[in-house]
């Protein structure tokens, strides 16, 4: 190798086959660390002593020439490898046992079993973060602040104080965000900060993170800080805060994504954006990962494609740095990267792998990243055995291993068949990573993404510029905020592209398919993947077959509406009304012309209602009616708004619960959608639809007992059918409808959307008057409320109604009634096939 690439060039030969000698010891340590933390101490000691004795005996016997009987006849390298596996397993068992004992040691676990109220002095070990909003029944569970910490001192109610070092998860009920206090004050805390908190200890969940207990804290007044963070964490905090300030003026997606992509700050990531990244298997880009460090090191030491060589590319030779100086500078960069980005599994893996590679670079020797990766895994699981059970760590290692082992061969095969080199490398990398990671993702999500590979290909081109410009903004923010804002603005273009790829991919009707969850499902998917890879090796020799299969896959992902209707029969031609299957909640659609539909309620989760509207072909919503503000009717609002033109939102005037009402106002204001109040007597028409609002009253509202009493109720006419939609009206309000001047119009409706998910609280007189031929109930499978109530179903059937429910029958579509009037008109109902 000539010296054309700069000072310090080291002659190297052609790289040989990958060195796999460290792989078995690393896997043995990983498996042992994953299996032994919860083992009884005696069993752990037995494993350690047994493996240690066998390993030492094998090494000693090999040197003396008297090998054990089971090892005789084996070559020296095999005996050494077996000994290394045994010794690494012993070390991992010892480390896992000590860490497990550390969790169980001290008074915290016993206090947690007694649900004791204590005052602790604790040191933060990670950045505080917000829990994700969850719908529980008709309310959204309060968002809490989650804090990983290490308890240094615990004081019991009797005044007894004990020193300890127990890891805990603090769940802080800090109320709503408030400048200078409450939730905001907790979220500003930095790792290594020491604070005092009073709360109730409860046992940690089995199989969760490595914690001795959970401490539930009421922290509305803010944290009580005992000691501030370390100097390194203060510097990292200033840098991260500077990046947030530099990105404040960016568009929504780039503002949320850029801090996460650069330093792992995901505080601005919305649940909707998070779901889009999960649906497209782009979560490794949502937060900082080892790829970020790879990009930075590549700028310094050269491109990753030369990783097997002591290359002299990048900025280092142009700055006149020697080989060892380059390694030292890269090591300092790696350490700073881990501190600023926090030691997440992927970051730790990348840092350890990079450190081993840098040591090889400093000595000027040949290196291979496969042993570097194996060494990283070995060191990390010995240092922190909890990583052995981390899905993030597993995905990170699998993806890196696929890129090192599978991708080069696949790339070469693609190049031999005429694929351009750059495209072949990118395609092989995406395919290899997806092949090995998909089974693990299926364990977590019970779903397989069909758009992961193209989305990763499209996003990958933007990762490097977004990362480099983002880190430049991070470094310049403390000294020149205007320059940092300019750099962040430049970075917002590639970051916005990544977010748009995720949203577009997730919005495709066939973006993913349901798959059996758990490890049995993972094994099944792994078997299918192996079969596809083996078949693919034969298919690449037949371009026409490849093209045909590609077209079929494209059709399965895009699912054109005419083709989908022919294949699945959904939605049925001429449908008038559809009830979406959104679990324990309500979301219904009234057809209002080609691609248009009036949506009544949005369900408890954005994904199901978005999927339902997509399958129905709804792209325009002339009106979205939210009958009341319970979470099981409005929490899915962003799913209705996703990628659709929504002209207006109409709601009840009773704005409780306040949290959900504020959520609706905020989302509507962000998209400039007018919000109006529905009042009894209001009549509207759009396309083939005509409806009148029956409730709530137009005059001064009565003293409602709760949001259900203020539900918007509608009487709808479409295509000769009459539908009565009752929201969640309670019996007193149903009785008030019977006393209204136009109550006679409620008689003999074709379709009844049963109030309150078919609960037992129904007015029998209204059911008898309505006398529906079809009664539809929206409820969730196995819901804790017993919906629908057997007496309600019995009363409806006694009146001659066909009763269908989403928990058993899935999504439902109603048609018929064209050109007919009166009791003889036909009502057709279609169930969506799973």
Regions found by a protein language model. Give the residues of each.
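Transmembrane helix-bundle segments that form internal channels/tunnels in multi-pass membrane proteins
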Residues: 5, 9-105, 118, 402-578, ...
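Non-globular, low-confidence helical/coil segments that flank catalytic cores
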Residues: 17, 184-187, 270, 278, ...
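Residue-level signal for inorganic ion chemistry
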Residues: 32, 122, 392, 437, ...
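Membrane-interface helix/helix-cap signal primarily in integral membrane proteins
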Residues: 1-23, 66, 70-284, 515, ...
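Short hydrophobic/aromatic residue motifs in ordered secondary structure
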Residues: 35, 129, 137-139, 144, ...
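Hydrophobic alpha-helical transmembrane segments in multi-pass membrane proteins
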Residues: 270-452, 517-564, 569, 650-653, ...
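Aromatic-rich juxtamembrane segments at the membrane interface
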Residues: 2-34, 207-350, 578, 600, ...
């Amino acid at each position: 190798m000539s010296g054309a690439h700069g000072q310090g060039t080291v002659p190297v030969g052609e790289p040989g086959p990958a060195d796999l000698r460290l792989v078995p010891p690393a896997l043995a340590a990983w498996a042992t660390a994953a299996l032994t933390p919860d083992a009884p101490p005696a069993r752990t000691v037995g494993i350690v002593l047994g493996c240690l004795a066998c390993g030492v005996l094998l090494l000693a016997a090999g040197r003396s020439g008297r090998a054990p009987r089971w090892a005789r006849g084996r070559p020296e390298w095999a005996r050494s490898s077996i000994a290394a596996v045994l010794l690494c397993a012993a070390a991992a068992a010892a480390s896992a046992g000590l860490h497990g004992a550390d969790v169980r040691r001290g008074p915290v676990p016993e206090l947690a079993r007694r649900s004791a109220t204590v005052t602790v002095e604790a040191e933060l070990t990670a950045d505080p973060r917000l829990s994700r909003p969850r719908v529980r029944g008709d309310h959204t569970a309060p968002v809490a602040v989650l804090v990983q910490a290490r308890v240094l001192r615990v004081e019991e109610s009797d005044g007894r104080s004990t020193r300890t070092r127990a890891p805990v998860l603090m769940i802080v009920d800090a109320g709503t965000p408030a400048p200078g206090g409450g939730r905001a004050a907790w979220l500003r805390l930095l790792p290594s900060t020491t604070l005092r908190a009073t709360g109730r200890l409860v046992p940690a969940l089995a199989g969760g993170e490595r914690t001795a207990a959970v401490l539930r804290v009421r922290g509305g007044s803010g944290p009580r800080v005992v000691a501030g963070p370390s100097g390194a964490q203060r510097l990292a905090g200033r840098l991260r805060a500077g990046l947030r300030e530099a990105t404040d003026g960016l568009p929504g997606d780039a503002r949320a994504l850029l801090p996460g992509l650069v330093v792992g700050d995901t505080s601005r990531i919305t649940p909707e954006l998070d779901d889009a990244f999960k649906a497209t298997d782009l979560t490794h880009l949502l937060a900082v990962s080892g790829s970020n460090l790879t990009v930075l090191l590549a700028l310094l030491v050269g491109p990753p494609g030369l990783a097997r060589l002591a290359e002299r590319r990048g900025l280092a030779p142009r700055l006149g740095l020697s080989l060892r100086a380059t390694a030292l500078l890269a090591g300092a960069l790696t350490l700073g990267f881990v501190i600023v980005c926090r030691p997440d599994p992927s970051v730790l893996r990348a840092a350890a792998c990079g450190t081993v590679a840098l040591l090889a670079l400093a000595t000027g020797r040949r290196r291979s990243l496969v042993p570097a990766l194996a060494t990283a895994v070995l060191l990390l699981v010995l240092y922190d055995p909890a990583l052995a059970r981390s899905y993030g760590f597993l995905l990170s290692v699998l993806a890196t291993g696929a890129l090192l082992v599978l991708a080069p061969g696949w790339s070469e095969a693609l190049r031999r068949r005429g694929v351009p080199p750059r495209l072949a490398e990118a395609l092989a990398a995406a395919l290899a990573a997806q092949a090995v990671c998909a089974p693990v993702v299926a364990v977590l999500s019970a779903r397989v993404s069909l758009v992961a590979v193209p989305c990763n290909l499209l996003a990958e081109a933007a990762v490097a510029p977004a990362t480099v410009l983002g880190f430049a903004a991070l470094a310049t923010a403390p000294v020149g905020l205007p320059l940092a804002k300019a750099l962040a603005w430049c970075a917002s273009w590639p970051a916005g592209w990544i977010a748009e790829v995720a949203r577009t991919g997730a919005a495709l009707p066939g973006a993913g398919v349901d798959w059996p969850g758990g490890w049995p499902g993972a094994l099944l998917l792994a078997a299918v993947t192996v079969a596809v890879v083996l078949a693919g090796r034969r298919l690449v020799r037949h371009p026409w077959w490849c093209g045909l299969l590609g077209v079929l896959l494209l059709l399965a992902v895009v699912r054109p509406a005419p083709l989908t209707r022919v294949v699945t029969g959904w939605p049925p031609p001429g449908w008038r009304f559809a009830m979406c299957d959104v679990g324990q909640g309500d979301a219904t659609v009234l057809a209002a012309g080609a691609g248009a539909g009036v949506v009544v309620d949005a369900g408890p989760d954005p994904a199901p209602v978005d999927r339902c509207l997509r399958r129905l072909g709804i792209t325009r919503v002339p009106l979205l009616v939210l009958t009341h503000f319970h979470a099981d009717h409005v929490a899915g609002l962003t799913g209705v708004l996703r990628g659709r033109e929504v002209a207006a939102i109409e709601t009840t005037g009773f704005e409780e619960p306040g949290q959900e009402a504020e959520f609706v106002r905020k989302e509507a204001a962000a998209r400039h959608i007018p919000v109006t109040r529905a009042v009894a007597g209001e009549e509207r028409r759009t396309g083939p639809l005509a409806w009148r609002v029956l409730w709530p009253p137009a005059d001064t509202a009565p003293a409602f007992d709760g949001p259900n009493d203020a539900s918007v109720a509608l009487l709808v006419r479409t295509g000769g059918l009459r539908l009565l939609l009752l929201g969640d009206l309670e019996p007193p309000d149903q009785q008030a409808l019977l006393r209204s001047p136009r109550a006679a119009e409620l008689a003999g409706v074709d379709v009844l959307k049963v109030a309150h998910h078919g609960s037992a609280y129904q007015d029998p007189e209204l059911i008898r008057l309505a006398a529906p031929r079809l009664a539809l109930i929206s409820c969730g499978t196995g819901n804790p409320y017993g919906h629908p109530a057997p007496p309600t179903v019995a009363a409806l059937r006694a009146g001659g109604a066909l009763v269908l429910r989403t928990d058993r029958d899935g999504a439902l579509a109603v048609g018929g009634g064209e050109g007919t009037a009166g009791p003889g008109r036909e009502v057709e109902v279609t169930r969506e096939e799973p």
